[in-house]
Design a protein with these regions (language model features):
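Glycine- and aromatic-enriched membrane alpha-helices
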Residues: 1-232
Length: 232
């Protein structure tokens, strides 16, 4: 309970002010975050990393035996609930029933679908049996990655964001599980922390009107690519 209170007051609240308040210094710099990629997922991802480092490995991992998921149907059910709820999370950030909300709704769905397929392909590429767990991890990464970009990109761009972000995050999951002593039980940092990094970079690249590829930049208006990357 104390951790939740401290995280909300000391981490989430300052990030929300910096990013969304008209006087926030990140907002003034031009950083783009449509629905909380930085505010929500960066804070959660890095808090999870800090917790995993502080608490250390579980006993099963100390003995060299990684535990398998307890209940795959519940994983699938939870992913489905996240999928449905994320529509309100992203589309609701348009603050109205309008075209922007519709666009955010669509890009969210397509990014998730692309990331889910990417997770399936990752299993196949590595010679593993295609699993529901891999698809669900990919789906969550797609949702995280599209969160900062949902209202700023097209459907085609959202497909790329979801697919590419899932590949990057699966690489990080592999490194964490096989090359480090960090026991991130639910892969929160790779999915939310790294997924957010990918999403913010792609937002800076693809954002309609102001992105690196599609926007007009001047010496007085730096590219959003670098502004969004600043947070990494």
């Amino acid at each position: 309970m104390l951790f939740i209170i401290l995280l909300s007051l000391c981490i989430y609240a300052p990030l929300a002010h910096w990013t969304w308040h008209p006087d926030g210094f990140l907002r003034k710099l031009g950083v783009l975050d449509f629905a909380g990629g930085t505010v929500v997922h960066m804070s959660a991802g890095f808090a999870a990393l800090a917790g995993a480092v502080f608490l250390g490995k579980r006993n099963t991992h100390r003995n060299g035996h990684a535990s398998s998921p307890a209940n795959i149907p519940f994983v699938v059910l939870g992913t489905g609930l996240l999928w449905f709820g994320w529509f309100g999370f992203n589309a609701g950030s348009a603050l109205g029933a309008n075209g922007l909300a519709t666009s955010a709704f669509a890009t969210t769905n397509f990014a998730l679908a692309a990331a889910m397929l990417s997770g399936v392909f990752w299993d196949a590429f590595n010679g593993r049996k295609i699993s529901a767990l891999g698809a669900c991890i990919g789906a969550v990464v797609g949702l995280v990655a599209i969160t900062p970009a949902a209202g700023f990109v097209t459907i085609g761009q959202s497909l790329f964001i979801g697919f590419a972000s899932a590949i990057v995050c699966n690489l990080v999951v592999y490194v964490f599980n096989n090359k480090t002593a960090i026991d991130d039980t639910l892969d929160v940092f790779p999915c939310h922390g790294v997924g957010r990094m990918c999403g913010m970079i792609f937002t800076g690249i693809f954002a309609n009107g102001v992105g690196f590829f599609y926007g007009q930049t001047t010496t007085s208006t730096p590219s959003r690519t670098w502004l969004n990357s600043f947070l990494i």
